[in-house]
Amino acid sequence: LLTLIKNYILTELSYSTPPQKLEQISFEININNYQPLMAHPERYPYYHKNYDAYTRMKELGFLLQVNLLSLTGYYGKRVAKAARFIIGNNLADFVGTDLHHFNHLRVLTDTNSIKIFEKYLGDKLYNEFR
C-alpha cells in the first residue's frame, strides 16, 4: 500500500454508480490507522443534486481534494458549481490536479484560470500553489 503524507490514502469512487457502502469503506480505512483522502468529489455526478453528501463524507472522516480544473468549468458547469460549493463551505482540505495531458496544463496556466483560482482560493493559497 502506497500512502501519501504519512498515512493518507487517496481514494476514488466510480463515476457511474454511487457507493453503496461508503460508511464501511471509511470505517475499514480508519480502523487500520489510515486517513482517507477523497479525490475530486465534485466530479461524481450523483452528488450534484445532493451537496449534503460532501458534508457526510467529512463526517465519515474523509478529507476532500478538489481538482483545480473543476473550478474553471473544464469538466462542465455542474462540476464547477460543486467544486465552488466545497471550497466556499470550507469542506476542501486539499486542491490538486488530474494532469494527464498537455491540454490540462494549458488550461491550468491560462490567465482566466488563474483569475478563477485567485477568486476562489485566495491570493495566499494561490501563491503557495505557484
Where are these regions (language model features)?
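Charged helix-capping and loop-helix junction motifs
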Residues: 23-26, 49-56, 77-87, 112-113
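Active-site environment of divalent metal-dependent phosphoester hydrolases
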Residues: 43-47, 71-74, 100-105
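Active-site neighborhood of phospho(di)ester-bond hydrolases with catalytic His/Asp-centered motifs
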Residues: 37-39, 65-68, 93-97
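Extended, charge-rich low-complexity interaction segments
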Residues: 10-11, 72-76
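Mid-to-C-terminal alpha-helical segments outside catalytic/metal-binding sites
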Residues: 109-130
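Short acidic/histidine-rich active-site segments
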Residues: 91-107
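Extended substrate/RNA-proximal surfaces in nucleic-acid metabolism proteins
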Residues: 1-63
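His/Asp/Glu-enriched short active-site or ligand-binding loop at hydrolase and phosphoryl-transfer sites
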Residues: 61-73
